[in-house]
A protein has these predicted regions:
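Short beta-strand/turn micro-motifs composed of small residues
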Residues: 52, 84, 164
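Structural microenvironment flanking redox-active thiols in thiol-disulfide oxidoreductases
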Residues: 63-115
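Short active-site neighborhood of thiol/selenol oxidoreductases, capturing the structured segment around
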Residues: 39-68
Length: 196
């Protein structure tokens, strides 16, 4: 291995968080629509790469609802890539109801979660349940996002990455608790700075 290739591989070590200025590597995963999604197919387009928890997570389903219902505000070129810590069949069971106009992927083995340094935290789960109780109750009882079948890690924390047309991360947001996603307004501002 040459020093250059060793340096390039440092960002792919498990547990290493991505930072602003890092280039994204390719992601190839099964999509909910039955295709195999290739992240490099988005070259030349800005997007948000969003890592969710397990497919029946109430906070995740509330976030998916927000992204789908407000997707039109992000412009024609901008898209979202949603990755879940669940098997494809479980993902379909819980996420198809959203009718997402963007790719929804299953990373059942957590390959890309490790590559992106996505954290697992029992404290983050507890913090989210306590500090976001009104949101959790709304998700459970207002929207019906009840996690009857949990397939995936319960301790996975969410993460969002805003990526420019060159495949460079412009913003990396690692959730501090189970419901901590990048605010929609930040996504919208980024999309507006990268118009069609």
């Amino acid at each position: 291995m040459t020093p250059q290739s060793a340096t390039q591989n440092l960002s792919l070590r498990p547990g290493m968080k991505k930072r602003v200025g890092d280039k994204v590597g390719n992601i190839r995963l099964n999509a909910m629509d039955g295709s195999v999604f290739d992240l490099f197919s988005l070259r030349g387009r800005p997007y948000m790469l969003s890592f969710f928890r397990f497919a029946s997570c109430p906070f995740c389903n509330l976030r998916m609802h927000e992204l789908v219902s407000r997707f039109g505000e992000l412009g024609e070129r901008f898209t979202v890539v949603a990755v879940f810590d669940s098997p494809l069949d479980n993902l379909r069971e819980h996420a198809e109801r959203h009718h997402a106009p963007f790719p929804v992927l299953a990373d059942e083995r957590g390959i890309y979660y490790r590559q992106y340094g996505i954290e697992r935290s029992v404290a983050g789960v507890m913090k989210g349940m306590i500090l976001r109780m009104p949101t959790l109750l709304h998700a459970l009882f207002g929207k019906g996002y009840v996690p009857l079948k949990i397939k995936g890690s319960m301790t996975t924390m969410p993460a969002d990455f805003l990526v420019d047309e060159r495949g460079v991360i412009q913003l990396a947001h690692y959730g501090k608790d189970e419901g901590d996603h990048l605010p929609f307004e930040a996504i919208k501002q980024f999309a507006e700075r990268h118009p069609a």
